[in-house]
């Protein structure tokens, strides 16, 4: 709109000082004009009444111009035509997007400016009483991707399809890339699965089967009797480990002279060799000597012969012990052929198996006898062996050299 004050039909503007108190009484109209002058706040304002634009033969999607009809001068309404006469809207098929970007004014974005022009065209058709084309009623879908505005994906689409989708209950997603065609990365791909236990293979129990062996055992039973048993055992070979025993892979000679000096409170280390061809060594646990109530008795064996019936493996025993210099009852014993017996077969089977080998150093001379109920004496190679049974039920045996001890009890 244009505001002017005319004088004498020439339309020359007055100065502000003259217009402040002056009043223009004449009205100018040119060419059957429909102009009208009003006084607002001391100013003469000429309102131009625009006639409704006649729709041209071409569509409004092209370049259109709207002008106000008025004599001499007229106000110009919102025009969408470009100065050079090109398609200003850019909404037609031949429209240029660069023209839209060139006309962007104010704080509007190119998309908002296109929407504003689109609504202005619809309004112009309504104001001209012209039917609005269907192309304007349909939403305009125009991509701005070549100029840097990509198409916005819908909310259901993934903006970063190659990124791990795990959020771990937080606002932000995992920053790692997904594995292959999966949704998650290597860290989160197995997060929701149940962890299965690892398969544990059962340990195979290996049994060492050896040939039957023979063990001569002399031990103290729960009743206090010295028992010598001989058993034939068939089965697996057991190894009893002892930190004080020495194992060797060499074959022990049967006729080995061992000189030991014994003490009542000493412990013995026995090692036995099996009769099998591989000559494996079996380390036996040591036995302690007991000395109670001034009565000394020695229990020797390949294991404790308790009433539980624990299996005793039988083999030839060889006494290996460090030499003790000082012993109150120590004597020098030589390995000789002797005969061992138990309390059950003391009188019946005394003469059987005369060739059994008895280990040296397993008999100890008793220090005191209260009373003797029965006794047996066997002479073998100048060595006297006397088996005595005391009133307490202990079977004791003493072996002495007749040259050293001339008399017996």
From Swiss-Prot:
Gene Ontology, cellular component aspect: nucleus
Chain ranges of the WRC domain: 158-202
Motif stretch (Bipartite nuclear localization signal): 163-173, 191-198
Predominant place of localization: nucleus
GO terms for biological process, alphabetical: developmental process; DNA-templated transcription; regulation of DNA-templated transcription
Family label: Belongs to the GRF family.
Name the record gives this protein: Growth-regulating factor 8
């Amino acid at each position: 709109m244009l505001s002017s004050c005319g004088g004498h039909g020439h339309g020359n503007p007055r100065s502000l000082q003259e217009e402040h108190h002056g009043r223009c009484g004449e009205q100018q109209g040119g060419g059957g004009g429909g102009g009208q002058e009003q006084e607002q706040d001391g100013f003469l304002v000429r309102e131009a009444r625009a006639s409704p634009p006649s729709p041209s033969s071409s569509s409004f999607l092209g370049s259109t111009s709207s002008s106000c009809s008025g004599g001499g001068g007229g106000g110009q309404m919102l025009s969408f035509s470009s100065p050079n006469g090109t398609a200003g809207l850019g909404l037609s098929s031949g429209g240029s997007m660069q023209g839209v970007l060139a006309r962007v004014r104010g704080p509007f974005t190119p998309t908002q400016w296109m929407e504003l022009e689109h609504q202005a065209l619809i309004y112009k058709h309504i104001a001209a009483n012209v039917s609005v084309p269907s192309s304007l009623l349909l939403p305009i879908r125009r991509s701005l991707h070549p100029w840097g505005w990509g198409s916005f994906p819908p909310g259901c689409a993934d903006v970063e399809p190659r990124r791990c989708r795990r959020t771990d209950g937080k606002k932000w997603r995992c920053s790692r890339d997904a594995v292959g065609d999966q949704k998650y990365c290597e860290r989160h791909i197995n997060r929701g699965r149940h962890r299965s236990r690892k398969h544990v293979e059962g340990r195979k129990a290996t049994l060492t089967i050896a040939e039957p062996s023979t063990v001569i055992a002399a031990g103290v039973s729960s009743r206090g009797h010295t028992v010598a048993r001989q058993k034939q055992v068939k089965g697996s070979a057991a190894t009893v480990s002892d930190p004080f025993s020495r194992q060797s892979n060499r074959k022990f000679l049967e006729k080995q002279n061992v000189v030991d000096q014994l003490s009542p409170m000493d412990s013995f280390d026995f090692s036995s060799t099996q009769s099998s061809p591989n000559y494996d060594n079996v380390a036996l646990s040591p036995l302690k000597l007991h000395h109670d109530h001034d009565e000394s008795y020695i229990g020797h064996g390949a294991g404790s012969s308790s009433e539980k019936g624990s299996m005793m493996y039988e083999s030839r025993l060889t006494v290996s012990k460090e030499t003790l210099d000082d012993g109150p009852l120590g004597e020098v014993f030589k390995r000789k052929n002797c005969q061992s017996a138990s309390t059950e077969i003391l009188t019946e089977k005394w003469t059987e198996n005369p060739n059994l080998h008895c280990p040296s150093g397993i008999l100890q001379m008793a220090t005191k006898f209260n009373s003797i109920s029965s006794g047996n004496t066997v002479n073998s190679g100048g060595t006297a062996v006397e088996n005595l049974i005391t009133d307490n039920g202990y079977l004791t045996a003493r072996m002495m050299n007749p040259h050293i001890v001339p008399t017996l009890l």
